[in-house]
Amino acid sequence: MLKEFKEFALKGNMVDLAIGVIIGGAFGGLVNSIVNDIIMPIIGLITGGIDFSNMFIQLAGEPRATLAAAREAGATIAYGNFVTLLINFLIIAWVLFLVVKGMNRMKKKEEAKPEPEAPREEVLLTEIRDLLAKQKA
């Protein structure tokens, strides 16, 4: 049973998947930092100093100054957080699109490679076979 598990776990696809998940998690953290620490502050500066992480609509209770206070008081729609996550998603989707596009281009190049010429001996043997077939006919 241990041998079967070892064969299953060490198959190429399983290891590739595990590596992909680990790299994907690290990439997600990197994109999250880029969005939160670089892109959103620039967008905030362009839009007049708006802090998107604190943008919300309070649905119940008295108006609150911060998102945390509004959530404690009742229902809120945190659309600033949604905008941040949407930008995060779009960046990840764009990078994945580029990766898939690059992989497809590499596959097409591999498929487009011409078949190697048959060895000269094989060509001669084919010609001899064809001549013998004509003589019999």
Swiss-Prot record:
Transmembrane annotation, as ranges: 15-35, 38-58, 80-100
Name of this protein: Large-conductance mechanosensitive channel
Coiled coil: none
Native source organism of the sequence: Brucella anthropi (strain ATCC 49188 / DSM 6882 / CCUG 24695 / JCM 21032 / LMG 3331 / NBRC 15819 / NCTC 12168 / Alc 37) (Ochrobactrum anthropi)
PANTHER family given in the database record: LARGE-CONDUCTANCE MECHANOSENSITIVE CHANNEL, MECHANOSENSITIVE CHANNEL MSCL
Complex formation: Homopentamer.
Subcellular location: Cell inner membrane
Top-level lineage group: Bacteria
UniProt cross-references to HAMAP family, sorted A to Z: MscL (MF_00115)
Single annotated GO MF: mechanosensitive monoatomic ion channel activity
Keyword annotations from UniProtKB, A to Z: Cell inner membrane, Cell membrane, Ion channel, Ion transport, Membrane, Transmembrane, Transmembrane helix, Transport
A GO term from the CC aspect: plasma membrane
Keyword Membrane in annotation: yes
Membrane topology field: Multi-pass membrane protein
Taxonomic path: Bacteria, Pseudomonadati, Pseudomonadota, Alphaproteobacteria, Hyphomicrobiales
